Amino acid sequence: MAILSHEYWKKFIEKDKNGKEELINVFEETQRPHFHDPRAPRFLLTDQQGKFALGIGGYLKTTMEYDFNGIVDDVDFIPALIPQPGSTSVRNQFQMDASTSTIFLKLVGRTKHLGNFIVYTAGNFRGSGKTFELQNAYLSFLGFTMGYDTGLFMDLAAAPPTIDFQGPDGMTFYRATQLRYEANVMKGLKVGVGVEMPSVDGTPAQDVRIGKQRMPDIPAYVQYSWAKASHIRVGGILRSMTYEDQVNNKAKSLTGWGIQASGTARLGGFQLYGQYTYGRGIAQYLNDISNLNVDIVPLADESGRMQVLPMKGWYAGLQYNFSKRVFASATYSQSRLFTEDCYAHFNETQYKKGQYLVANVFWNVSHNLQVGAEYLHGWRENFNDVNREANRINLSAQYNFCLLYTSPSPRDS
């Protein structure tokens, strides 16, 4: 067994005669592209034959937050959680958070029948009472991935960089237990399809119970890449949501669906990001709206019946790379819940629209240390047209127990 720090990888590669170079390359080629995911592991444990390598890494991150002229009732900046009028007189708030600090283990192996395979587990301290919470636990081989991971109905590489852990409202982000298959069918063209564990968040109603689900969620996508860190992607998801009509003692189902277009492109020192999502009954997948429990909602004046509402989310962002160590970005996003069958009439104080504006700058002080500063502004509008706003300043310091990816542009998966 050999233990290697990342600084010695190149020396190790030069002396390699047992296929270990290929394993090290797999670590970097399969690096997760989301801004908040940890980078390549700093330490490796390898076996004598060079068939297996275990990477250990993570980061410690501390954030200071100050809200002014309106607050958000959470450590993440979620416009849906801007307090309702009259619920609080507090207009300023100071918070600190270290719960997004992350630890991961990544095993890479080579076998005769499975080829290169990956076992990845990661977690942070976002559990109840800041306890450890699993974020990823999956096995990948031959294009298949099984386990718990971020969902397939999202585009990690097209997400803009933020200190705020949630990210823009209207962006698709969720995690699910799943089985998926992804393949490169030709140069630049990649496809994926999966089945995911369903989870339905609905508004409580008399004579209705949301319980066991009978069908998996089915996401799929097609992605075309024309250069490093440049791609467009079109995806969709189909879901069946079961609820119990206790008036007629009958199980009923509603169909939810969503479509999405996303992408990112590198133009000189600039990086562009964007996403647009529209659908029905897809609330749990969209930032901001996912806090409202509106996958399915009661149908007005009809006891025991539910309905699905239309909704959308989108964002557009721009990043400029001043150098390999310094970059800045700005993103605007919006999410919207639409009404049908008098839903707004009976829920006037319900969220109708959220907006999110963020601007930030990051400095990679060294391979291990990154600091950042960020301004956020959020708006919440209800169906009765009442508006509330909030502002936040974030400051962060992140020390990486892994190799910091100093190139500030995303990596395509």
Model feature map: region roles:
Residues A227-Y351:
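Detector for outer-membrane/organellar transmembrane beta-barrel domains
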Residues D67, R110, N124-S128, F153-D155, ...:
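Sequence/structural signature of outer-membrane beta-barrel proteins
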Residues L134-N136, A176-Q178, M215-Y221, H231, ...:
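Transmembrane beta-barrel architecture of outer membranes
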Residues K112-L114, G143-M146, K187-V191, A229-I232, ...:
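Repeated loop/turn-to-beta-strand initiation elements of outer-membrane beta-barrel proteins
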Residues M1-F68, S407:
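N-terminal periplasmic/intermembrane-space "pro-region" immediately following the signal or transit peptide
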Residues L45-D76, G86-V200, R214, P219, ...:
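Outer membrane beta-barrel
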Residues Y405-D412:
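Conserved small/polar residues in nucleotide/adenosyl-binding loops
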